[in-house]
């Protein structure tokens, strides 16, 4: 997609693409120095925080988070992302973990972004199960009762047909 809306920039920086400047998968130009992503902000506020970025889609780490997370895992399957996150939680190696799953996006681009598409719904349900397994692993930590975790799940974009959608309520 030539001028694809890339919500990873919004998710990671908290500002609209008019400010962070990322409009396609080249991530160039960008204004991450002016509008740093949340890993940089957390590191500034809490220098000792242990961070991990575990992703299916490599450009998230390669173009945005490389050098900013203590642990970088890239090009994993969605099951691999889940498993690596559970391992990090079990080993207590990270205080902040960013995950990127991609199977729902693949299903949308392949079969269609619609609740009427069984493959799309199945991918959402599989992702929901993975998130549930991660939350269960988090809650199984021996120190969980004394910890204060925040789990945020967000979609980076909707779609129309098999393409990226527009900024409409139905496609968000």
Residue positions per predicted region:
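Structural beta-sheet core signal
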Residues: 53, 99, 151-153
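Active-site-proximal alpha/beta segments of enzymes that process anionic O-linked groups
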Residues: 1-92
């Amino acid at each position: 997609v030539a001028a694809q809306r890339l919500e990873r920039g919004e998710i990671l920086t908290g500002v609209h693409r008019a400010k962070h400047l990322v409009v396609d998968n080249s991530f160039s130009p960008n204004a991450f120095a002016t509008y740093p992503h949340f890993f940089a902000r957390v590191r500034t506020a809490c220098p000792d925080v242990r961070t991990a970025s575990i992703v299916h889609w490599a450009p998230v780490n390669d173009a945005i988070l490389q050098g900013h997370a203590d642990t970088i895992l890239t090009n994993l399957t969605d099951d691999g992302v889940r498993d690596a996150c559970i391992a990090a939680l079990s080993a207590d190696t990270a205080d902040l973990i960013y995950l990127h799953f991609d199977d729902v996006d693949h299903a949308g681009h392949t079969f269609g972004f619609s609740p009427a598409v069984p493959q799309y719904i199945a991918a959402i349900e599989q992702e929901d199960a993975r998130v549930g397994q991660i939350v269960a692993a988090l809650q199984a930590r021996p120190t969980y009762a004394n910890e204060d975790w925040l789990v945020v799940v967000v979609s980076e974009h909707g779609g129309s047909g098999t393409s990226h959608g527009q900024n409409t309520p139905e496609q968000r």
